[in-house]
């Protein structure tokens, strides 16, 4: 197991940054342009795996307004993407496909740390982007986005891809903030949630950004999500696994057996692609209709965690390895793209890309 600081590919990034200045200056001036240019130039490549899929890092220097995005209306994916593009890079068109999410997640407690393990599983291969954000009126965080969802698996290769990668904060799939709150999204088999109770609407990606920026505990995250109507993205349904520094781990989901799709919160140590609120009705190694699948992976995680007295990082990695998945083109939730152990007390993340278990990248919020 190795820990790497990464190689920024300085020469190539420098050339792209120079080219980017003209593009930004065409639509912005002053502080607006400077913050976009700084963000563009922060992109660096951290890994050097063979092939098209690697780990990148970007630090967000521009300001964004989540409330303005929400107020613009996120009734569908395109409306959300348009609102985000106006915030991130006004005046430059960026075509982005809505993301999809799979996975496994669990909480483990050790004497000096509270850990959240996370496998991001999806059939389409992807590079990963570590996104650093520190909004003016919010909490600093690190999160991970799938660059394939942004059409930018090799962002250093073109200005178009580099610009698309700037949307990373609004396509994050998991992350942790400076208060020790971590969150991961997992896909489900039910029809997409579309709540319509009269509250302001958010979607799947906005939920993650809101929690990372504004929640100091799991309870605050639950209260925050409960103040909005949920609109699921990309034609699929999802739930959220949330943990904090106290070890308060819960699954937030939207009841598929109630037409109004009310938010339901369930305490759980581990979860995959089935409803925690209907866990007793879900069988392993099979599809369970709208209630989901993948319980065998949760049981494998539980077996590892229950088999030890101290749930260390080594134990967390063992649980992630035993629940990781090889590629299967017929299964959207196969093919583990990355695995992470978040430490909610020390606010760190240890990251492995595409089951390369011997190469671990470590980050601090």
Question: For each of these PLM feature ranges, what is it?
Answer:
Residues 3-4, 13-16, 20-216, 230, ...:
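N-terminal mature-domain region immediately after signal-peptide cleavage
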Residues 235-285:
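Extended amphipathic alpha-helical segments with heptad-repeat/coiled-coil character used for oligomerization
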Residues 217-220, 224, 297, 316:
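General structural feature for long, well-ordered alpha-helical segments within catalytic domains
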């Amino acid at each position: 197991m190795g820990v790497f600081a990464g190689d920024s590919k300085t020469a190539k990034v420098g050339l792209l940054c120079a080219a980017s200045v003209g593009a930004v200056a065409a639509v912005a001036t002053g502080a607006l342009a400077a913050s976009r240019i700084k963000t563009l130039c922060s992109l660096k490549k951290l890994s050097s795996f063979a092939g098209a899929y690697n780990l990148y890092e970007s630090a967000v220097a521009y300001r964004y307004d989540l409330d303005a995005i929400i107020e613009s209306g996120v009734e569908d994916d395109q409306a959300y993407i348009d609102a985000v593009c106006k915030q991130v890079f006004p005046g430059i068109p960026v075509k982005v496909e809505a993301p999809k999410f799979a996975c496994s997640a669990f909480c483990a407690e050790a004497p000096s740390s509270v850990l959240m393990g996370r496998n991001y599983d999806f059939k389409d291969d992807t590079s990963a982007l570590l996104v650093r954000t520190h909004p003016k009126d919010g909490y600093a965080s690190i999160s991970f986005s799938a660059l394939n969802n942004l059409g930018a698996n090799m962002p250093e290769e073109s200005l178009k891809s580099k610009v698309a990668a700037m949307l990373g904060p609004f396509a994050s799939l998991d992350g942790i903030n400076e208060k020790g709150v971590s969150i991961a999204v997992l896909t489900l088999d039910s029809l997409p949630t579309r709540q319509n109770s009269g509250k302001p609407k958010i979607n799947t990606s906005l939920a993650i950004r809101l929690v990372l920026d504004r929640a100091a505990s799991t309870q605050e995250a639950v209260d925050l999500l409960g103040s909005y109507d949920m609109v699921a993205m990309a034609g699929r349904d999802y739930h959220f696994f949330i943990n904090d520094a106290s070890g308060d781990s819960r699954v937030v989901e939207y009841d598929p057996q109630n037409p109004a799709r009310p938010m339901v919160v369930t305490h759980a140590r581990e979860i995959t692609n089935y409803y925690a609120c209907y866990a007793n009705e879900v069988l392993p190694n099979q599809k369970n209709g709208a209630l989901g699948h993948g319980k065998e992976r949760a049981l494998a995680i539980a077996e590892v965690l229950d088999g030890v007295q101290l749930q260390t990082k080594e134990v967390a990695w063992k649980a992630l390895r035993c629940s990781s998945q090889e590629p299967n083109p017929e299964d959207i939730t196969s093919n583990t793209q990355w695995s992470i152990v978040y430490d909610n007390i020390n606010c760190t993340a240890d990251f492995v890309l595409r089951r390369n278990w011997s190469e671990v990248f470590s980050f601090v919020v």
